[in-house]
Amino acid sequence: MAETQTLKAEAREKGSKGAVRSLRRAGRVPAVIYGDKQSPELIAVSYKDVSALYQTGTFMSHVLDVEIGGKTERVIPRDVQFEPVRDFIIHVDFLRLGKNATVTVDVPVHFHNHEASPGIKAGGVLNIVRHEVELVCPADAIPEQLDIDLTGFEMGSSIHISAVKLPAKVSPTITDRDFTIATIAAPAAVVSADNEAKTEEAGEDKSEEKSSGKED
């Protein structure tokens, strides 16, 4: 599980568009904390701080402690809005997490021991179907990543979610099938040559059938 980061914030009043623009010009980002059967709380956070967290690539799947004055709210980011032209953050929605809360998050998949896969050693290619897997997790036990060991996987193998060891109380949102995360595929050149060979064999078989028919 990832270490919980702290984000400092300040309370703000609901204001006009002009007030919000002034806030942004001062290097602050308007945000809101909602959920857990409590009233929404309007806050402002440092653009520099929230941008640095966002650029880690795992912002949306990490629990944060937001410090507002003398209190701390445990939250997880749920939406980030960007300025459409200059592509900088202009608003963030945080979901407040109560005790024993569960969350749905996208967790990245990491592959290990490529050199121990007979399929890859033979020239196969790791074809990643899902770079992330959507999981339901306790808010205090979100996996940093899912690790898949490629040892022993042959050419043509498929790696399914059942091959991944998930932490306790963590489950995929897709439960009606053993979905594929990756495959060990033959390189295009090998596939092309194999298809050509099959086409030639099929053609030869048809020619032999025609010849047999004429002899009859």
Swiss-Prot record:
A GO biological process held by the record: translation
Top-level taxon of the source organism: Bacteria
Keyword Cell inner membrane applies: no
Biased amino acid composition, Basic and acidic residues: 195-216
InterPro entries: Rbsml_bL25/Gln-tRNA_synth_N, Ribosomal_bL25/Gln-tRNA_synth, Ribosomal_bL25_b-dom, Ribosomal_bL25_C, Ribosomal_bL25_long, Ribosomal_L25_dom, Ribosomal_uL5_bac-type
Region (Disordered): 1-21, 192-216
Residues that span the membrane, as ranges: none
Annotated Gene Ontology cellular component terms: cytosolic large ribosomal subunit
NCBIfam families listed in its UniProt record: bL25_bact_ctc (TIGR00731), PRK05618.1-2 (NF004128), PRK05943.1 (NF004612)
Family note: Belongs to the bacterial ribosomal protein bL25 family. CTC subfamily.
Its job: This is one of the proteins that binds to the 5S RNA in the ribosome where it forms part of the central protuberance.
UniProt name for this protein: Large ribosomal subunit protein bL25
Organism phylogeny: Bacteria, Pseudomonadati, Pseudomonadota, Alphaproteobacteria, Hyphomicrobiales
Gene encoding the protein: rplY
